[in-house]
């Protein structure tokens, strides 16, 4: 493989939890983890250059608000606009880390410029429970039954296999984003 090609792979934090056992929680986590394993092997076998960036609950303008790929923030925004109760999967204490889409774009650009063939993670330092996020919207809350495959804790790790994951700093905060959303809607 001598094509001077570089890939920036959008990895997922969904497959990192519970010492790797979360890789089988969903088809999404499963395929993302297998793709990453393939990239790791392509580097070992052929010297293939890539950067992997682990994204954490991306939010921002024009995010998906309905359907299987909807983001939790997108769902809450739609429910807020429709003046419906925000739906939270029981018990609501599931924690997540969040990343604004502008931090994703800036992070991808910085990684591309560095060209170091590393793994990176990008997320706001603070974790929030889904219930705490819902409360930030100052709306009624309705609890849904627990779901199979639900992760209960945000998973941040420092290594995948023997590869160090380098943290990238975020500029944007989910609290500020939600407050701004409420103020403008």
Predicted regions and their residues:
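Alpha-helical substrate-binding/gating segment
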Residues: 58, 74-87, 95-121
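Conserved beta-loop-beta element that borders a ligand/cofactor-binding pocket
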Residues: 11-12, 38-62, 87, 141
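Conserved Rossmann-fold NAD(P)-dependent oxidoreductase catalytic core, especially the SDR/UDP-sugar
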Residues: 1-27, 51
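Active-site helix of classical SDR
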Residues: 27-34
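Active-site beta-alpha turn of Rossmann-fold NAD(P)-dependent dehydrogenases/reductases
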Residues: 8-13, 54-56, 92, 123
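Glycine-rich Rossmann NAD(P)(H)-binding loop
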Residues: 58-62, 88-98, 120-128, 135, ...
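Conserved C-terminal active-site "lid" loop/helix of NAD(P)H-dependent oxidoreductases
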Residues: 101, 129-132, 147-180
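Mid/C-terminal beta-alpha module of Rossmann-like enzyme folds, strongest
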Residues: 82, 105-149
């Amino acid at each position: 493989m001598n094509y001077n090609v570089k890939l920036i792979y959008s990895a997922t934090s969904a497959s990192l939890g519970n010492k790797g056992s979360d890789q089988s929680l969903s088809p999404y986590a499963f395929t993302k983890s297998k793709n990453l394993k393939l990239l790791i092997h392509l580097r070992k076998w052929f010297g293939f250059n890539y950067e992997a960036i682990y994204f954490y609950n991306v939010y921002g303008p024009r995010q998906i608000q309905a359907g299987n790929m909807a983001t939790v923030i997108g769902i809450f925004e739609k429910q807020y606009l429709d003046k419906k109760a925000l739906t939270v999967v029981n018990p609501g204490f599931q924690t997540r880390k969040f990343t604004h889409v502008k931090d994703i774009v800036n992070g991808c650009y910085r990684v591309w410029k560095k060209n170091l063939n590393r793994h990176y993670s990008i997320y706001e330092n603070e974790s929030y429970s889904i219930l705490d996020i819902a409360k930030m919207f100052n709306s009624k809350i309705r609890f849904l039954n627990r779901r199979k495959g639900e992760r209960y804790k945000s998973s941040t790790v420092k290594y995948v296999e023997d590869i160090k994951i380098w943290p990238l700093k975020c500029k944007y905060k989910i609290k500020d984003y939600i407050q701004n959303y409420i103020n403008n809607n």
